[in-house]
Protein backbone atom coordinates (compact mmCIF):
# COMPACT_ATOMS: atom_id res chain seq x y z
CA UNK A 1 0.00 0.00 0.00
CA UNK A 2 1.41 3.38 -0.98
CA UNK A 3 1.88 6.02 1.72
CA UNK A 4 -0.93 8.13 0.23
CA UNK A 5 -3.34 5.17 0.15
CA UNK A 6 -2.27 4.18 3.66
CA UNK A 7 -3.00 7.71 4.91
CA UNK A 8 -6.44 7.57 3.26
CA UNK A 9 -7.07 4.16 4.88
CA UNK A 10 -6.18 5.45 8.36
CA UNK A 11 -8.16 8.64 7.87
CA UNK A 12 -11.23 6.71 6.69
CA UNK A 13 -11.09 4.08 9.42
CA UNK A 14 -10.45 6.51 12.27
CA UNK A 15 -13.12 8.98 11.16
CA UNK A 16 -15.62 6.17 10.69
CA UNK A 17 -14.73 4.68 14.08
CA UNK A 18 -14.88 8.01 15.92
CA UNK A 19 -17.94 9.66 14.33
CA UNK A 20 -21.39 9.20 15.82
CA UNK A 21 -23.02 5.92 14.99
CA UNK A 22 -25.10 3.29 16.74
CA UNK A 23 -22.16 1.77 18.64
CA UNK A 24 -20.61 5.05 19.72
CA UNK A 25 -23.91 6.51 20.86
CA UNK A 26 -24.73 3.31 22.76
CA UNK A 27 -21.25 3.31 24.38
CA UNK A 28 -21.61 6.98 25.31
CA UNK A 29 -25.07 6.44 26.72
CA UNK A 30 -24.13 3.36 28.74
CA UNK A 31 -21.03 4.98 30.25
CA UNK A 32 -22.76 8.29 30.93
CA UNK A 33 -25.77 6.69 32.59
CA UNK A 34 -24.06 3.88 34.50
CA UNK A 35 -20.31 4.59 34.58
CA UNK A 36 -17.51 3.02 32.59
CA UNK A 37 -17.29 -0.17 34.70
CA UNK A 38 -20.96 -0.94 34.22
CA UNK A 39 -20.66 -0.37 30.46
CA UNK A 40 -17.91 -2.97 29.99
CA UNK A 41 -20.44 -5.73 29.18
CA UNK A 42 -21.96 -3.55 26.48
CA UNK A 43 -18.51 -2.74 25.07
CA UNK A 44 -17.45 -6.40 25.16
CA UNK A 45 -20.58 -7.49 23.28
CA UNK A 46 -20.04 -4.77 20.69
CA UNK A 47 -16.39 -5.72 20.26
CA UNK A 48 -17.00 -9.43 19.75
CA UNK A 49 -19.93 -8.77 17.41
CA UNK A 50 -17.84 -6.22 15.50
CA UNK A 51 -15.07 -8.79 15.01
CA UNK A 52 -17.49 -11.44 13.73
CA UNK A 53 -19.07 -8.94 11.31
CA UNK A 54 -15.64 -7.83 10.03
CA UNK A 55 -14.65 -11.45 9.38
CA UNK A 56 -17.93 -11.98 7.51
CA UNK A 57 -17.23 -8.84 5.47
CA UNK A 58 -13.76 -10.22 4.70
CA UNK A 59 -15.29 -13.46 3.47
CA UNK A 60 -17.74 -11.62 1.23
CA UNK A 61 -15.18 -9.18 -0.19
CA UNK A 62 -12.56 -11.92 -0.66
CA UNK A 63 -15.07 -14.22 -2.38
CA UNK A 64 -16.07 -11.47 -4.78
CA UNK A 65 -12.40 -10.82 -5.59
CA UNK A 66 -11.81 -14.51 -6.33
CA UNK A 67 -14.93 -14.80 -8.51
CA UNK A 68 -14.01 -11.80 -10.65
CA UNK A 69 -11.06 -9.51 -9.83
CA UNK A 70 -12.71 -6.73 -11.87
CA UNK A 71 -15.36 -6.55 -9.17
CA UNK A 72 -12.75 -5.06 -6.83
CA UNK A 73 -12.23 -2.11 -9.18
CA UNK A 74 -15.99 -1.62 -9.28
CA UNK A 75 -16.18 -1.91 -5.49
CA UNK A 76 -13.49 0.78 -5.21
CA UNK A 77 -15.83 3.14 -7.04
CA UNK A 78 -18.75 2.00 -4.89
CA UNK A 79 -16.59 2.50 -1.79
CA UNK A 80 -15.59 5.99 -2.91
CA UNK A 81 -19.25 6.82 -3.58
CA UNK A 82 -20.21 5.53 -0.12
CA UNK A 83 -17.45 7.61 1.50
CA UNK A 84 -18.70 10.72 -0.34
CA UNK A 85 -22.28 9.94 0.71
CA UNK A 86 -21.11 9.51 4.31
CA UNK A 87 -19.28 12.86 4.06
CA UNK A 88 -22.48 14.51 2.82
CA UNK A 89 -24.55 12.96 5.62
CA UNK A 90 -22.03 14.08 8.26
CA UNK A 91 -21.71 17.60 6.81
CA UNK A 92 -25.47 18.11 6.67
CA UNK A 93 -26.40 16.42 9.94
CA UNK A 94 -27.28 18.48 12.99
CA UNK A 95 -25.12 18.39 16.10
CA UNK A 96 -25.73 15.42 18.39
CA UNK A 97 -28.70 15.71 20.74
CA UNK A 98 -27.59 15.14 24.31
CA UNK A 99 -31.18 14.38 25.36
CA UNK A 100 -31.30 11.13 23.37
CA UNK A 101 -30.34 8.40 25.83
CA UNK A 102 -31.19 4.82 24.93
CA UNK A 103 -31.26 2.39 27.84
CA UNK A 104 -28.03 0.45 28.31
CA UNK A 105 -28.15 -3.11 27.08
CA UNK A 106 -26.27 -6.28 27.96
CA UNK A 107 -23.56 -8.29 26.26
CA UNK A 108 -25.72 -10.44 23.96
CA UNK A 109 -27.98 -7.61 22.86
CA UNK A 110 -25.01 -5.39 21.97
CA UNK A 111 -23.39 -8.40 20.23
CA UNK A 112 -26.53 -9.05 18.19
CA UNK A 113 -26.96 -5.41 17.24
CA UNK A 114 -23.74 -5.60 15.23
CA UNK A 115 -25.38 -7.82 12.62
CA UNK A 116 -27.90 -5.10 11.75
CA UNK A 117 -25.48 -2.18 12.13
CA UNK A 118 -25.28 -0.98 8.55
CA UNK A 119 -22.51 1.49 9.39
CA UNK A 120 -20.02 -1.21 10.39
CA UNK A 121 -21.02 -3.57 7.57
CA UNK A 122 -20.39 -0.83 5.00
CA UNK A 123 -17.25 0.19 6.93
CA UNK A 124 -15.82 -3.33 6.61
CA UNK A 125 -16.74 -3.97 2.99
CA UNK A 126 -15.65 -0.47 1.94
CA UNK A 127 -12.28 -0.64 3.71
CA UNK A 128 -11.48 -4.12 2.44
CA UNK A 129 -12.64 -3.68 -1.15
CA UNK A 130 -11.26 -0.16 -1.51
CA UNK A 131 -7.96 -0.22 0.34
CA UNK A 132 -6.88 -3.87 0.77
CA UNK A 133 -8.08 -6.12 -2.05
CA UNK A 134 -6.79 -3.90 -4.87
CA UNK A 135 -3.32 -4.25 -3.28
CA UNK A 136 -3.34 -7.90 -2.23
CA UNK A 137 -5.71 -10.84 -2.20
CA UNK A 138 -3.69 -12.86 0.28
CA UNK A 139 -6.21 -14.33 2.71
CA UNK A 140 -3.97 -13.79 5.75
CA UNK A 141 -3.79 -10.04 4.95
CA UNK A 142 -7.54 -9.80 4.45
CA UNK A 143 -8.20 -11.54 7.78
CA UNK A 144 -5.49 -9.49 9.50
CA UNK A 145 -6.96 -6.21 8.27
CA UNK A 146 -10.43 -7.40 9.33
CA UNK A 147 -9.13 -7.92 12.85
CA UNK A 148 -7.46 -4.49 12.68
CA UNK A 149 -10.77 -2.94 11.57
CA UNK A 150 -12.52 -4.52 14.56
CA UNK A 151 -9.80 -3.19 16.89
CA UNK A 152 -10.14 0.31 15.41
CA UNK A 153 -13.92 0.11 15.87
CA UNK A 154 -13.48 -1.03 19.46
CA UNK A 155 -11.07 1.86 20.02
CA UNK A 156 -13.76 4.27 18.82
CA UNK A 157 -16.37 2.73 21.11
CA UNK A 158 -14.07 2.89 24.14
CA UNK A 159 -13.16 6.51 23.36
CA UNK A 160 -16.83 7.45 23.35
CA UNK A 161 -17.49 5.53 26.55
CA UNK A 162 -14.52 7.14 28.32
CA UNK A 163 -15.31 10.62 27.08
CA UNK A 164 -18.93 10.47 28.29
CA UNK A 165 -20.18 13.96 28.98
CA UNK A 166 -17.11 15.56 27.45
CA UNK A 167 -18.11 14.47 23.94
CA UNK A 168 -21.70 15.54 24.53
CA UNK A 169 -20.57 19.06 25.42
CA UNK A 170 -18.25 19.27 22.42
CA UNK A 171 -20.95 18.14 20.01
CA UNK A 172 -23.46 20.52 21.58
CA UNK A 173 -21.15 23.55 21.23
CA UNK A 174 -19.11 22.72 18.13
CA UNK A 175 -21.08 19.93 16.49
CA UNK A 176 -21.72 21.63 13.13
CA UNK A 177 -18.10 22.74 12.69
CA UNK A 178 -16.81 19.33 13.69
CA UNK A 179 -19.19 17.61 11.26
CA UNK A 180 -17.95 19.79 8.38
CA UNK A 181 -14.29 19.10 9.20
CA UNK A 182 -14.94 15.35 9.39
CA UNK A 183 -16.87 15.48 6.10
CA UNK A 184 -13.99 17.25 4.35
CA UNK A 185 -11.58 14.62 5.65
CA UNK A 186 -13.83 11.91 4.20
CA UNK A 187 -13.84 13.68 0.82
CA UNK A 188 -10.03 13.58 1.02
CA UNK A 189 -10.27 9.81 1.60
CA UNK A 190 -12.46 9.33 -1.47
CA UNK A 191 -10.07 11.31 -3.67
CA UNK A 192 -6.98 9.48 -2.33
CA UNK A 193 -8.45 6.14 -3.44
CA UNK A 194 -7.74 7.04 -7.06
CA UNK A 195 -4.90 9.59 -6.88
Curated annotation (Swiss-Prot):
Q: Where in the cell is it found?
A: Cell inner membrane
| Reaction it catalyzes | O-acetyl-L-serine(in) = O-acetyl-L-serine(out); L-cysteine(in) = L-cysteine(out)
Which residue ranges are assigned to the Periplasmic compartment in the record's topology?
A: 1-9, 68-69, 126-141, 195
* Biological processes per GO annotation: cysteine export across plasma membrane
Which keywords does this Swiss-Prot/TrEMBL entry list? Amino-acid transport, Cell inner membrane, Cell membrane, Membrane, Transmembrane, Transmembrane helix, Transport
Which GO molecular function annotation, any one, does this entry have?
amino acid transmembrane transporter activity
Query: Which InterPro entries would you find in this protein's record?
Result: LeuE-type
Where are its TM segments located?
10-32, 47-67, 70-90, 105-125, 142-162, 177-194
Pfam families from the UniProt entry: LysE
Spans within the Cytoplasmic topological domain? 33-46, 91-104, 163-176
Q: How does it sit in the membrane?
A: Multi-pass membrane protein
One GO cellular component term noted in the UniProt record for this chain: plasma membrane
Q: Which family does it belong to?
A: Belongs to the Rht family.
What is its biological role?
Exporter of O-acetylserine (OAS) and cysteine.
Q: What is this protein called?
A: Cysteine/O-acetylserine efflux protein
